[in-house]
């Protein structure tokens, strides 16, 4: 029977979304072949071996929660009692973090369907708007001003997905958005498998998002690198801002 690297096998079996993620699971001691822990990412394992991931290396419904939790801790922001919009909610990692930190209500918005974790669907504090583009939100979707907007969207630039949600923000409202260079950069700057490796491109797209937010009436507080990478090892950034008075 043919063999291949443990990290690649985890990806092929759908147990990790990228080799970078697979390597993190192996380092955390969460990946097994049979009952034996996988020791190294490069370990050769039979392609038909019984492999599994046991436990999690974070407490959230998805690893996306690691990103927002890091940002809020770094910023020292208390969001207890906040009404929030989660743009690109997906499984609900960001929503999970906000509820854990005391958010009063979260409007979970995603163009997909049946992605939000069941425990969040059952939470009275979560208002689910599936199959709903953030670009077409109305007062029927968001019937109150919001204190916080978070965003982890894919396949679209922030300047295209955020303007409508931002219109629901109170003066002084806060924003934490994930900058994904592969969706902000020029097409020729995006390499194989959608990866942007050029640090100069990273810096430029972060600057462009910052400038756009400030032109839109928001004061940028800080931009920090995400504590974990995206698919295929893409470096991502978290930008934080507050809404200025009109």
What is the predicted role of each segment?
Residues 1-49, 83:
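A basic, amphipathic helix-loop patch mediating RNA/tRNA/ribosome contacts
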Residues 91-102:
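Conserved SAM-binding loop of SAM-dependent methyltransferases across substrates and taxa
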Residues 228-246:
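Core SAM-dependent methyltransferase catalytic element
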